[in-house]
């Protein structure tokens, strides 16, 4: 897997400003916002499937939107619009952090630590470690907050064989319902067969959330790139549905040879670990049990550009497992 590999591109992406969430025209519809397209100052109502997204989709923020007609999952929003419709959807939000001390004089760096190794030659000295980022630059992140985009990203990642925990795939389909009478009844993101003949099931989650201090981790240095990515968000409204899928996935794993995976598409690069949300102990417990029974966690980190291009970064982000 090569860092920097192209994954996909959102067609028609353009800059906008989020004027009001929820929309002033539809104040009771959480999935709609008022936005302004910056290139021509057009104002319109846009679909906002991420809702507030732990502060990443709030009034006043810069965002990236694209034309996106409604699909079958937007029926509730369309019904609330009383026959009207939307033409654009919010896909990414723009996060900027300014390093106010980047031009300050810096003290001299201490010498690098050294380690010794024995070889056929006389004892030699070998430098170890590498310089850590000093956060000299500002932090600018284009973060995919539309939960639907994680499925598109993962589909491309599967096709390009970007994940070590999932061998090359021979065939697969999206949104497959699996029923085992009295045991399992869930629709999973992907179901298919690997080239080694072993079936796999994957449930995909979108992870735009991150904090400097999360759970038991307290940061004082707050390097821009030391945040903890977490899932689910603080205001999660579908915990029961997600836990049911995790339990069903766990059941399938315990009763078959199927590769069962929980995938987390981390939509930003200013993080150094993934943790299951300290704001949702029910979800944490379900994940812990799943992992204990052999379900695998796949953390896929994606970097986005202003042009809506998704770039593969890594599938080896350290994961903090629940310890409840």
Model segments located where?
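Short, charged beta-turn/beta-strand-edge "cap" motif at the junction between a beta-strand
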Residues: 22-24, 50, 66-79
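Active-site metal-binding core of divalent-cation-utilizing nuclease and nuclease-like domains
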Residues: 23, 97-103, 141-148, 163-217, ...
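Domain-level recognition of nuclease-like catalytic cores that cleave nucleotide substrates
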Residues: 268-324
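Acidic-basic catalytic patches of nuclease active cores, encompassing PD-(D/E)XK
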Residues: 102-129, 133-181
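Beta-strand/loop nucleic-acid-binding surfaces
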Residues: 41-56
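Nucleic-acid nuclease catalytic cores
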Residues: 204, 210-211, 216-281, 301-303
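Structural detector for short beta-strands of small beta-barrel domains
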Residues: 8-23
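Short aromatic-glycine-enriched beta-strand elements
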Residues: 24-34
């Amino acid at each position: 897997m090569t860092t920097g590999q192209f994954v996909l591109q959102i067609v028609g992406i353009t800059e906008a400003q989020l004027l009001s969430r929820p929309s002033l025209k539809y104040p009771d519809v959480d999935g709609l916002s008022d936005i302004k397209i910056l290139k021509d100052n057009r104002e319109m109502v846009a679909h906002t499937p991420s809702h507030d997204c732990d502060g990443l989709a709030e009034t006043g923020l810069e965002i990236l939107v694209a034309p996106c007609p409604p699909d079958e999952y937007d029926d509730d929003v369309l019904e609330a619009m009383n026959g009207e419709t939307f033409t654009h959807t919010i896909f990414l939000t723009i996060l900027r952090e300014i390093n106010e001390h980047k031009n300050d004089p810096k003290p001299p760096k201490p010498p690098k630590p050294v380690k010794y190794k024995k070889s056929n030659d006389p004892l030699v000295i070998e430098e170890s470690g590498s310089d850590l980022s000093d956060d000299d630059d500002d932090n600018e992140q284009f973060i995919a907050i539309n939960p639907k985009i994680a499925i598109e990203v993962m589909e491309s990642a599967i096709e390009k064989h970007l994940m070590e925990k999932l061998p090359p795939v021979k065939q697969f389909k999206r949104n497959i319902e699996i029923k085992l009478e009295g045991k399992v009844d869930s629709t999973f993101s992907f179901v298919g067969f690997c080239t080694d003949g072993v079936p796999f099931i994957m449930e995909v989650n979108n992870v735009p959330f991150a904090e400097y201090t999360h759970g038991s981790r307290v940061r004082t240095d707050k390097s821009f790139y030391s945040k903890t990515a977490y899932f689910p968000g603080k205001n999660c409204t579908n915990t029961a549905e997600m836990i049911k899928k995790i339990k069903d996935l766990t059941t399938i794993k315990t009763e078959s040879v199927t590769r069962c995976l929980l995938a987390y598409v981390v939509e930003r690069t200013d993080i150094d670990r993934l943790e299951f949300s300290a704001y949702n102990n029910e979800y944490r417990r379900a994940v812990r049990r799943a992992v204990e029974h052999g379900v695998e966690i796949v953390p896929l980190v994606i970097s986005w550009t202003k042009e809506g291009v998704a770039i593969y970064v890594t599938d080896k982000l350290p994961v903090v497992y629940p310890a409840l």
